[in-house]
Structure formats: structure tokens, C-alpha cells
Amino acid sequence: MLFFFKAPKFMYGSIKRKNLCFATSTIDISEEDNTDTKTSSRIIVVTSGKGGVGKTTATANIGMSIARLGYKVVLIDADIGLRNLDLLLGLENRILYTVMDVFEGQCRLDQALIRDKRWKNLSLLSISKNRQRYNVTRKNMQNLVKALANLNFRYILIDCPAGIDVGFINAISPAQEALIVTTSEIPAIRDADRVAGLLEANGIFDIKLLINRVRSDLIQKNDMMSVRDVQEVLGVPLLGAIPEDNQVIVSTNRGEPLVLKKKLTLSGIAFENAARRLVGKQDYFVDLDSPYKGVFQKIFDLFSGN
């Protein structure tokens, strides 16, 4: 028996904010550009505060899932100097140029975009490999995102650096929406709460929550906070909950997101469902706090046809 509950209507709200300009072969990084250009692009920053909670894994899998739904998607790896998004997508050997090269006029923006061979409507853009994060300003990020919107990307997902320093502030500056990734551990929840406050302080109020590495066995023993408890503590609309899955390690080493596996694991199903809710195609959650033993396996059987 499966349990579902209706997603709140307000979780799909969006705040319109201005984007910035794009030049022909390089990104215009002038400080004078105040052009207010409307765009249909959704600009979403994926953040966590605490490192190691699965933020980059979530970005890769949700981004890939959205692309599989038919939308044009670009993932920006803004974790400067510690990039890993290319590894999770299996694109590490194809990066020739980065955004820093575009800023410096060494290449065009389209040359720095790496298109996924499996899904042509998914692209990756790395900010840099070895430069300090402080070299990328808010204006740089805003102009970059406007340039990508002008290339008709429907979804622009920014994989934000961990922490709450200057790199975080610069990375979130062009975003309209935010997705906070956390686990049920107390330190991660505390950091997520602080990040939510910083996002609101910087004008981002459309915030959603993704709870990662959920273990039903620990929840039933009261050794882990439930999904509902975490959501209530943070007071942020819930996008989804991802069960613990050992296949994440295998997926990372192979450079293949979980959502591309022929036989989806429970976490792969959960990532796909979260992506569908993000684009407004699914209104219901699977209740991972169900007291019935084996609910995860029942969900898996339902989607895998067993």
C-alpha cells in the first residue's frame, strides 16, 4: 500500500527578477548594464551550506531528469576549484574551455558549453578549474546567466559552492529560485536553516527543500528525524526525499546519473519524481515516513514492474 499527499500549491511560485546583458563573443562584464530583459528561463541555485550532503549528485540527477522530460537545460558548476559535476555526468574529458576563458575573451560562450551525448538538450558549463572563487563577481554571474537565457535554456541550474562565504553569495546572485539539499542530521539541518535565511536576505524567496539519504529503518527506530520533522523544522516547502542508496557510488564512478539506469533504484525514482514536481508535472509525494514495513520496496516494485 502506498501513501501520497498533495504538494502545496505555493511551492510552484516564481519570483520575476531581472537578468543582464550578453555580448557577441564574450560576456559583457561591465558594471553599468542595468538592462531589464524578461525571460522564460527558470534560474535555480542548488545549495546546501554543509558539504557532503549530496548537492552535486542532486544537481546532476535532477538536471538530467528535466532534460529527459524534453526541456533545454544547462548545469553551471559554480564550485570553483573543487568541481565535480563533470565527473558525475561523465564529461570530465570533454572540457576544453571554462567560463573564465569566456570572461577573458579566449573563447565564445557556446564553445565553453559541453553538450551531453546521451541527451542533446542537456549542457554543462564549468566556471573554472583552478582559479580562486573570488575572481567571479556577482555581475559576472548575472551576465553569464542572462547570456544563457538568451540561448533559450529553459532551466538554468547553478551548483553552488558549499559554505556561506563570498563564493556562495556570488553564485546565488542571479537566481530566481533555490533548492536546498540537506540530510536528516542535526548539523546539516542547522546549516540548511542558515542558508534559507541568507537566501531570503538576498531576495530569493521561492525556496524548496530536498532531503537526501533518508533511511526508513532508522526513522522507525527514532534514530533519524522523519521527512516531515525536517520539513517542519526548516519551514521550507518540500520538493522531495531521496532514500539512501549504495548505487550512488557506482553511479559516480561510472559518470552515469542514477536516473539513466535501465532498472531504476529507489533513489533514481525519487530524483525523477522530484524533477517532475519541479517542472509542475506531478503534484503528489510518496510518503517516505509511512509506518508500514517495506514501503521503499513497494515503491520500487511499482515503478520497475515487479
Swiss-Prot record:
Subcellular location: Plastid, Chloroplast
Tagged with keyword Aminoacyl-tRNA synthetase: no
Any one annotated GO CC term: chloroplast
Pfam family, one: CbiA
Main location: plastid
InterPro entries according to UniProt: CobQ/CobB/MinD/ParA_Nub-bd_dom, MinD, MinD_FleN, P-loop_NTPase, ParA/MinD_ATPase
GO molecular function ontology, one term from the record: ATP binding
Keywords: ATP-binding, Cell cycle, Cell division, Chloroplast, Nucleotide-binding, Plastid, Septation
Coiled-coil spans in chain: none
A single GO BP: negative regulation of cell division
Sequence positions that bind ATP: K50, G51, G52, V53, G54, K55, T56, T57
Function: ATPase required for the correct placement of the division site.
Record family assignment: Belongs to the ParA family. MinD subfamily.
Protein name: Putative septum site-determining protein MinD
